[in-house]
A protein has these predicted regions:
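Phosphate-interacting basic helix/loop segments used at nucleotide- and nucleic-acid interfaces
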Residues: 1-22, 63-70
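Walker A (P-loop) phosphate-binding loop of P-loop NTPases
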Residues: 144
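Hydrophobic positions on the alpha1 helix immediately C-terminal to the Walker A/P-loop
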Residues: 150, 154
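Conserved lysine of the Walker
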Residues: 147
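Hydrophobic anchor at the beta1->P-loop junction of P-loop NTPases
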Residues: 139-141
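Conserved P-loop NTPase
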Residues: 267-293
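Switch/coupling sub-region of P-loop NTPases
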Residues: 155-265, 278
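P-loop NTP-binding catalytic core
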Residues: 32-133
């Protein structure tokens, strides 16, 4: 992890500093910006080959990495940025750059969620109370729907004395920053330390809550095992319909021989499922809401 500077990011910097910008995407030809207020739009800026080369070189140096025909993918994290670059030897349309912002704040507030019709006030209060009585949550949605932001909102209702362990490959939750004074441990997985390793190690750290940034594969088995011991938690998952959640989790589990037992475990330990969706209106504005609970 490194500290970003205007010199490193060049023309990207103005968008990084803009608090309403969430994503900066370059497809090899055009620069696309995703803004909370304006929606997604193309910026009329021409990025020279020289700038792109300098930018990728700066990022590679910051993480002691390389971007070339051998190392085709470059990934880097700062405290609030997740950067992904794909080399033009495989991105035939030109080098591809994605910068996603994950600020150390909770974007959603109760008043704004009600005003923007994110969900009915009655449902919102019910879900807040579900957190307070230690229920397990799974937040579903498609990429960019706002699953993590929704999870971060509900995390603020966890008691500060409850030890929370977050497990992420890219640090997006920022639990200690959004809940100052809370008992929290933040784990980052990577080479030699998998999600499953982190989940199993967490059991010896006296957690009350275990937060998995995203359930993608067989680590969901270990997560459910942890929840079965009385540890509570949140996770997010790619999903387009909440009714598919049990099958989606079951397909990721590494034990398919006893399907009935696995299905029973899912229904037993997943207390609350929330599907978050986003849509773009005719003016290009992005709107998010809880579509299913």
């Amino acid at each position: 992890m490194f500290e970003p500077t205007p010199k490193q990011f060049g023309v990207f910097w103005e968008f990084i500093e803009n608090p309403t910008v969430t994503d900066i995407d370059y497809n090899g030809r055009e620069l696309w910006i995703t803004d909370l207020k304006k929606g997604k739009y193309k910026k009329n800026i021409t990025l020279s080959d020289s700038f792109i080369s300098t930018f990728t070189h700066n990022i590679a140096n910051s993480v002691n990495g390389n971007l070339n025909k051998v190392n085709k993918i470059l990934e880097a994290d700062t405290k609030e940025l997740r950067i992904s670059v794909i080399h033009d030897s495989v991105a035939t349309s030109g080098i591809s750059i994605c910068i996603r912002k994950s600020p150390c704040l909770i974007r959603n507030t109760i008043d704004e969620m009600i005003k923007e019709k994110y969900c009915p006030e009655m449902i919102l209060q019910l879900l807040i109370n579900c957190v307070r009585v230690n229920m397990n949550f799974v937040f579903g949605g498609e990429p960019g729907a706002g699953k993590t932001e929704c999870a971060k909102f509900f995390m603020q209702f966890i008691r500060p004395e409850d030890r929370v362990i977050t497990i992420e490959d890219s640090l997006e939750i920022h639990y200690r920053e959004i809940n100052p004074g809370a008992d929290a441990v933040e784990l980052k997985v990577g080479d030699g330390f998998t999600y499953t390793d982190a989940i199993k190690a967490s059991l010896r750290q006296n957690p009350k809550w275990l937060m998995l940034s995203e359930a993608r594969s067989t680590e969901v088995t270990s997560l459910l095992e942890q929840w079965s011991t009385g540890v509570h938690g949140f996770t997010t998952i790619h999903l387009d319909d909440l009714r598919k959640l049990p099958d989606r989790i079951q397909n990721m589990m590494n034990n398919v021989n006893d399907a009935a037992r696995m299905e029973n475990r899912i229904y037993r330990y997943v207390d609350v499922g929330i599907l978050v969706k986003r849509h773009v209106d005719q003016n290009g504005q992005i709107h998010r809401k809880m579509d299913q609970v």
